């Protein structure tokens, strides 16, 4: 009994000692942290080959109904690297910058080059930054875009996230690129990453996203127009809600495309594994949403042929333009590399063949109605 009594006392002392050496909390209180909703990267003005980092910080408020609009603070700092600038920003505030909820990274248009991996490396290495964060280009600057607060932006929300998330805006003119996807495509041979380009109006109270940028090693990145961005989305990402304007003589048709699918295969050159052509087949389904003349459902096959011919010309023109500029946003080269037996000169052979490859495009438009009731 005496032994059991000593054992019990030993357990009590051991438990008390363990409680004394425990920390009160492993994390900082929520009121000691500032949550960054977006971050912008611009070329530094006062630091040679440096960067200007701007963070958009969400300010807390009591209740959503007590706030008429979102409340944000903006902090900026220049540094030789992204990490250095962010560390210096922490000396400007009395709290800790929390990056775990950040979903949008905005990069100045002039920084969208192949060497952007040197500063994007910071976001990949930090464990608290989500790899599913959206990455976009900015014009005229990332700081300007971050400070735009649209009138449609609701309290406790960030408009930038709604543009790229599938839960809100689903426009076919908006390209969505994730951080992990950008990193993967930059390091891969045979594909050029494509990022959305965010702009603003003259008043600075609206965000406009209907252009995109093809990332390449050039000093001035290639910007895709609104129409070219739509073609890219419809072919590669099978976006819905597309519209195509078809003209023949005095007849004008506006097609509302609800489904789009592209398949292609390489046509090899005789006696060589290098492709001489790309045989591409595109199927689109939709209805006629608008017309300047009366339409008849009996002529639906005629409208299909007319639409197929017009859409083919538009898409072929876009593909040839990308080829002439030696850009490959669709990743034809990457597909070729990954479906062939590896050799040291495989990608070199593709680079030599790509400028002369012929695009054989077949478009099949299947209109399901004229949008009218007879």
Task: Please provide the spans of the model-predicted regions.
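Membrane-proximal alpha-helical signals and transmembrane carboxylates
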Residues: 2-374
């Amino acid at each position: 009994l005496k032994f059991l009594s000593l054992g019990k006392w030993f357990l009590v002392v051991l438990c008390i000692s363990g409680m004394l050496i425990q920390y009160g909390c492993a994390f900082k209180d929520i009121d000691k942290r500032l949550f960054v909703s977006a971050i912008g990267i611009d070329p530094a003005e006062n630091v040679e080959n440096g960067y200007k980092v701007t963070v958009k910080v969400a300010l807390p408020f009591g209740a959503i109904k007590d706030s008429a609009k979102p409340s944000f603070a903006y902090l900026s700092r220049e540094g030789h690297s992204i990490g250095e600038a962010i560390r210096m920003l922490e000396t400007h505030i009395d709290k800790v910058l929390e990056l775990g909820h950040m979903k949008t990274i905005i990069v100045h248009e002039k920084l969208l080059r192949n060497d952007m991996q040197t500063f994007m490396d910071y976001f990949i290495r930090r464990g608290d930054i989500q790899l599913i964060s959206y990455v976009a280009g900015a014009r005229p600057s990332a700081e300007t875009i971050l400070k735009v607060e649209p009138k449609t932006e609701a309290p406790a929300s960030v408009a930038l996230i709604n543009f790229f998330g599938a839960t809100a805006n689903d426009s076919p003119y908006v390209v969505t690129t994730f951080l992990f996807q950008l990193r993967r495509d930059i390091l891969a041979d045979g594909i050029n990453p494509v990022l959305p380009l965010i702009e603003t109006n003259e008043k600075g109270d609206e965000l406009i996203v209907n252009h995109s940028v093809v990332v390449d090693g050039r000093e001035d990145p290639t910007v895709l127009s609104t129409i070219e961005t739509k073609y890219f989305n419809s072919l590669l990402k099978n976006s819905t809600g597309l519209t195509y304007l078809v003209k023949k003589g005095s007849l004008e048709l506006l097609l509302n495309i609800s489904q789009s699918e592209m398949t292609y295969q390489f046509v090899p050159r005789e006696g060589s594994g290098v492709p001489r052509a790309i045989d591409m087949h595109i199927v689109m389904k939709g209805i006629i949403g608008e017309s300047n003349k009366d339409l008849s459902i009996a002529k639906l096959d005629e409208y299909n042929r007319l639409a197929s011919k017009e859409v083919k010309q538009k898409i072929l023109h876009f593909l040839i333009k990308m080829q002439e500029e030696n850009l490959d946003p669709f990743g034809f080269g990457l597909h070729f590399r990954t479906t062939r037996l590896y050799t040291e000169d495989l990608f070199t052979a593709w680079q030599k063949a790509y400028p002369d490859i012929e695009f054989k495009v077949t478009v099949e438009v299947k209109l399901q109605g004229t949008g009218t009731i007879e």
